[in-house]
Structures are given as structure tokens and as C-alpha cells.
Amino acid sequence: MVKIKEAIVVEGRYDKNTLSQIVDAPILETSGFGIFKDKQQLKLLRKVAALRGLIVFTDADGAGFVIRNHIRSAIPGKYLKHAYIPDIPGKEKRKAAPGKEGKLGVEGMTPDIILQALRNAGATIEGETEKRTTGAITKADLMTLGLAGIPGSEEKRKKLMKKLDLPEHMSPNALLQALNLLYDLDGLAEVLEEL
């Protein structure tokens, strides 16, 4: 079991159950879209985020990004880290049919994928060196590298996200945040050469 300093917020009880078998950390639920109406739960998330930091770990589908963006708008960014799972087609074992977008959610991920997503988010893991955001890659760099602001940039971003196992619904700003956790500018340029 991996001990993590930050609390983790997930969409529902099955996600919470999956994570609780892998990590030792406080795990809170949004109850899916319930977070939009539950002011007390949002207040709790704000308090926990200010005390120990909060890792937002939602599914890679459209609904997961709506929930993630709601949390992002309600809690100061300095308290948040974002863990992203890759887009993997399939369905969870407990379900009769795949979800609307046909992707596995957090509950359907392997322990290795979950731990890698948490490490990539910069989770503070006991016994490991803390990963810090370098901030070396800027929005201007994304434009220079052809990932934003020019014809074809959206397609290039999609190819990059697929190569890096990042979800397709990431905005350019969310992609920038993830890239700064994973690469410096030279490292990103090398990855882009392989596309």
C-alpha cells in the first residue's frame, strides 16, 4: 500500500473502493454530479485541500471533466493536483454495458496505471522524492511547437495526448499543466519529433 500525503477526490464509491485497495490516503467522493448541489461536500473539499492538498482523480470521459472543472473553479489552484487516466476502451466488470463514451473509468484501471497517474500528478508519496512542477513550458511554447493557435494544432495535440496516454477531453491549459509535470521543453520537443 502506497502512502500519499494529499487527499484524493473521486467521482463515486466504486472509484473510492478501487483506490482504497492501492493507496493509503483520505479518499473523498463527489457522488458524481451531486457535487454541484452539495454545498457541504464542496466546503469539506475546500477545507481538506487547504490542510493537506487535494488530488482530483476523475474519469477520462466528458462527465469526469465537467466534475473536474467544477472543482477547479471552486478551489484555489495552489491546493490542487490533477491525476489523469488514459483513454482505454472497455467496461468495468460490474457493468453490463460500457459507459456512454465506451471508456474505462478510474475503477477499471490497473494498480500500476493508477499509481503512475498519481506520480505524474505530483502526489507526495511517502519514501519517494517529491515531484515538482518546473513551469518550464509556456503557452507561447505550445504555439511555437504547433500545439496551439495554428491550423492543425488541435489534431497535433490529440496525437500527443494519445501518445502520452492522456485523456482526449483535456483543454490546452490542462495539457500544459500535465506537460509541465512530465517534461521540460527539450523533452517535449523530443516527444513531438516521434509523432
What does each model-found stretch correspond to?
Residues G34-K37, F57-I67:
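Acidic, metal-coordinating catalytic cores used for nucleic-acid/nucleotide bond scission
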Residues I85-R132, K139-L142:
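Activity-critical C-terminal alpha-helical subdomain
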Residues E6-A7, R13-N17, Q21-L51:
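Acidic, glycine-rich catalytic loops of TOPRIM or P-loop NTPase phosphate-binding modules used
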Residues Q116-R119, A123, E128-L195:
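C-terminal, charge/polar-rich interaction regions
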Residues V10-E11, T58:
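Short beta-strand scaffold positions
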Residues L44, G62-F65, N69-P76, D112, ...:
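Phosphate- and other anionic-substrate recognition elements at nucleic-acid/protein interfaces
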Residues Y14-D15, D61-A63, I88-G90:
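Conserved nucleotide-binding/hydrolysis micro-motifs of P-loop NTPases
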